[in-house]
Amino acid sequence: MQARYSVSDPNALGVVPYLSEQNYYRAAGSYGGMASPMGVYSGHPEQYSAGMGRSYAPYHHHQPAAPKDLVKPPYSYIALITMAIQNAPEKKITLNGIYQFIMDRFPFYRENKQGWQNSIRHNLSLNECFVKVPRDDKKPGKGSYWTLDPDSYNMFENGSFLRRRRRFKKKDVSKEKEERAHLKEPPPAASKGAPATPHLADAPKEAEKKVVIKSEAASPALPVITKVETLSPESALQGSPRSAASTPAGSPDGSLPEHHAAAPNGLPGFSVENIMTLRTSPPGGELSPGAGRAGLVVPPLALPYAAAPPAAYGQPCAQGLEAGAAGGYQCSMRAMSLYTGAERPAHMCVPPALDEALSDHPSGPTSPLSALNLAAGQEGALAATGHHHQHHGHHHPQAPPPPPAPQPQPTPQPGAAAAQAASWYLNHSGDLNHLPGHTFAAQQQTFPNVREMFNSHRLGIENSTLGESQVSGNASCQLPYRSTPPLYRHAAPYSYDCTKY
């Protein structure tokens, strides 16, 4: 093992020591006579020069540098010993003869004899390719002879001592001999090859075992990966681990049939399909706008649609001309019902034709829009009874409330039912069952345009709860204003006052 630790100019800071020329372990005072220190990363041809192989010994005498003679040869110690043995006349040589051959052939090893000679002895004793031969008494001298194992002559590739194939071991040589004998001899006489054949035959069996174990270990994870594409509702309802692994993992199609009513996976029951089927469902078509987040299970609705005359595209508040039918105006706000909340009952007015239908369903919160026979001018408006006071941010407070029109007697019950529906959907905490006369107070309302009603829901203005102190029994709108009412915001064609017509 030769020293590669050398240092460059002592004035140069941060220089890696072994990348320069002079010896690191030189005697003190040797830095004065330095000859041409090298650069750190230079590819100079004198990179393998004098200082690269100088001795470790601090007592080594300072000699003038001879770079060409002191380059370490690119051979391993095993190659050097093999060269010495093969150059001997009898193919055997003593330890001292090996030393002498190396020093004569390579002047690099003429220095630091203690270091490399120790390495030579280690390699002779550790490598099985070198065989120790006892010395004859006939020849003078001392020490045993060293020779090469006959099977180790081909341990270097193509006779080059620069590359060695592998570490020589006698066990490998004996196995190779047995294999060769087994190949040459016929199968009945293969007695020598018997110990080697089970070892070779067991190798593919072990490989098969390994493959089987790997496939078994990987098999439980395969259904989770491959069965994500389950599309049939039967597979989602089975109790097999495949469907149980695939349904929560992300196959939405398998859980769609029971997804709306029960919401088993904790998914919200509201979807785009609900809105689309609300708009285009046939008469009597069932749908369940499941309230998965609100915790309410809503029964399916039967929505029979009536024939829609062209009056659906008329003015928004087409009130009846006679005073007796004061509650019979129709607000055709088709876009508001289906696109702002799918069933937002607070925008629309209910004609008197809905009184009988609503009186059959007194339980408001469980069936908010149960069996509404929609009137001719509404077509899917899904109206609830006059809660236009909830758009309190857009009312005109200057309009004085006229006296309420004579109301038919069965109107309080549908008003309460639809008021509960509005409070259920719009999250109003106040219970509106106590408003008997609040049903069709249509004359007191002044309508802004549809856009302002959209803005009120979009901006979240109508979050105030309706209590008993805020809404009185005579249906006069006494509501606190959360924001400044947008009076005179739009031009005359956009603001409709229902009390003028």
Swiss-Prot record:
> Which residues does this entry mark as bearing Omega-N-methylarginine?
R279, R293
Stored SUPFAM superfamilies: Winged helix' DNA-binding domain
Q: Cross-link (Glycyl lysine isopeptide (Lys-Gly) (interchain with G-Cter in SUMO2)) at which positions?
A: K184, K214
- Tell me the function of this protein: Transcriptional activator.
Q: What is this protein called?
A: Forkhead box protein C2
Residue ranges of the region described as Disordered:
167-208, 232-268, 383-420
- Read off the InterPro entries from this record: Fork_head_dom (IPR001766), FOX_domain-containing (IPR050211), FOXC1/C2-like_FH (IPR047391), TF_fork_head_CS_1 (IPR018122), TF_fork_head_CS_2 (IPR030456), WH-like_DNA-bd_sf (IPR036388), WH_DNA-bd_sf (IPR036390)
GO annotation terms (biological process): anatomical structure morphogenesis; apoptotic process involved in outflow tract morphogenesis; artery morphogenesis; blood vessel diameter maintenance; blood vessel remodeling; branching involved in blood vessel morphogenesis; camera-type eye development; cardiac muscle cell proliferation
Disease (UniProt) = Lymphedema-distichiasis syndrome: An autosomal dominant disorder characterized by primary limb lymphedema associated with distichiasis (double rows of eyelashes, with extra eyelashes growing from the Meibomian gland orifices). Swelling of the extremities, due to altered lymphatic flow, usually appears in late childhood or puberty. Most affected individuals have ocular findings including corneal irritation, recurrent conjunctivitis, and photophobia. Drooping of the upper eyelid (ptosis) is a variable feature of the lymphedema-distichiasis syndrome, occurring in about 30% of patients.
Which residues fall under the DNA-binding region feature? 71-162
> What PROSITE patterns does the record tag this protein with?
FORK_HEAD_1, FORK_HEAD_2, FORK_HEAD_3
Q: Name one GO molecular function term.
A: RNA polymerase II cis-regulatory region sequence-specific DNA binding
Instruction: List, as start-end ranges, the regions of compositional bias called Polar residues.
Output: 232-249
> Which residue spans traverse the membrane?
none
Q: Coding gene?
A: FOXC2
